[in-house]
Amino acid sequence: MPLLISRFAELDLIRQPEQQDEPLQAFDAADEYLLSHVAETGLSLDSRVLVLNDSFGALAASLARHANVVSSTDSFLAAQGLEKNLARNGMAYDAVPLIPASEPLSGPFDWVLIRIPKTLALLEEQLIRLQGQLAPGARVVAAAMVKHLPRSAGDLLEEYVGPVQASLAVKKARLLFATPRPQEVRTSPYPTRYTLDEPAIELLNHANVFCRDGLDIGTRALLPCLPKNLGAARVADLGCGNGVLAIASALENPDAHYTLVDESYMAVQSATENWRAHLGERDVVLRAADGLDTQQPDSLDVVLCNPPFHQQQVVGDFLAWRMFLQARAALVTGGALYIVGNRHLGYHTKLSRLFRGVEQVAATPKFVILKARK
């Protein structure tokens, strides 16, 4: 893989999760453009730099030796990528403090460097949290590849920070420069809430939760197929989002034990609040993680999963395949994985390569619900 070369450093970077023969690199032209701008403008060792949504540490690791850098992300995998890439390039893995997007920021910051996220609600929430956190004369610069830069991203920067000027495109990347101006403190529109009929519960959703304004149709198809009469089974909701699958299952299975995991900190925050709202102090494990990567082998009886098909702007089934592998490792012999997937994705064939028995539990015109037994 090519090195990320800037005036600050030459870095050998890897993506997360690591894959053999990885076809994609861990940085892009938007990272290079942003680093070039910072170098041309000038940076001092005592500058406080906040990096938002750094994919795998390309920005924070490049600047780590040249300023007081803090990184905030909603992605556990991105946070893990930063730590691994710092260590990979001769720095302490914790050389850059990490702040999950679910936690408040602590300024003042002289620079704010933003990679525009796929979910603009996350960007909006991050900009709202910047209120009162900018030092006098602070510079706020956002970057994206042109094909992933909606006009509304600039509108949000203008609304919450100040006037925006766009750069020329370089190598199909563009920068947005926002000049901070005094303005009234704004109240966040997040979290949002919606109500289900069956089960009859209200669900809270922080800004970066998938389908935060209503139940996604895949989960809607899976809900009626959740297993019942589980007794004291150990159940994991893999990629839990706001926790709806685990909560619905737990309401039907009062003696079962649940683990909810997601790589989004805001998803885990939402799931935690929803669990407490509907199940009180009932024991549960909730964690931001790389799926079931740290789950003990043969420690689960059931895994529930509505697998994602993209990582930011990268689309593919590599995350789903990784989840299937993790589920197989974590399940006891005879344990079962329940998933929902688009018909065209061919999950039945993929699961048949990993599990001894795969059956279709239900189907809609768009989705299939599958049960795979180890």
Curated annotation (Swiss-Prot):
Swiss-Prot/TrEMBL catalytic activity: guanosine(1835) in 23S rRNA + S-adenosyl-L-methionine = N(2)-methylguanosine(1835) in 23S rRNA + S-adenosyl-L-homocysteine + H(+)
Entry superkingdom: Bacteria
EC number: 2.1.1.174
GO cellular component term, pick one: cytoplasm
Family label: Belongs to the methyltransferase superfamily. RlmG family.
Primary role: Specifically methylates the guanine in position 1835 (m2G1835) of 23S rRNA.
CDD domains (alphabetical): AdoMet_MTases
Provenance organism: Pseudomonas syringae pv. tomato (strain ATCC BAA-871 / DC3000)
Protein name: Ribosomal RNA large subunit methyltransferase G
